[in-house]
Amino acid sequence: AKDVSEFDTLDELKADIKKKLTEQAEAAADNEVENSLNNSIIDKLEGEIPEVMYENRITEMVRDWEFRNRYQGITVKDYLKYTGATMEQFRDNFREAATKQIKLRLALEKIAQYENIEAAEEEIAKHYADLAEEHKMEVEKVKNIISVEALSEDIKVEKAFNFVKDNAEIAS
């Protein structure tokens, strides 16, 4: 075991493998529960959602795609050229995810409102600090980019999801 791993004995190696497999299985199960909850929340959302909300989210997703692929030297223009797709087809690739995200966000905002879920000043400060650390920026720069209102809404949505998750009856 020592020759092929950082462990001194085969038993230690087996225990580590078992632990990692258990962690992966638990993460997959948690992910499945979250996806199921998301779908349940979305299914319960009623009312018309303006198309412009979907279009705006798709535009954000295209911008995110551009940002992620910029470092590999791939632009949307290049992608369209290589794939033979139109900009409309490219944007349509994001439509399903954008639709789910918008519906989920609206439903969770409504739950947060209904349950009087708020974002405490300490939570907002912690999120700013976490974002600053994650992006290797000063907190003040992050505050200039993300408004207190926007961050507060994100925190309330996150707390609303946790509220739903904590109160959901999950069948195994």
Predicted regions and their residues:
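Extended, charged alpha-helical "arm"/coiled-coil substrate-binding scaffolds
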Residues: A1-S172
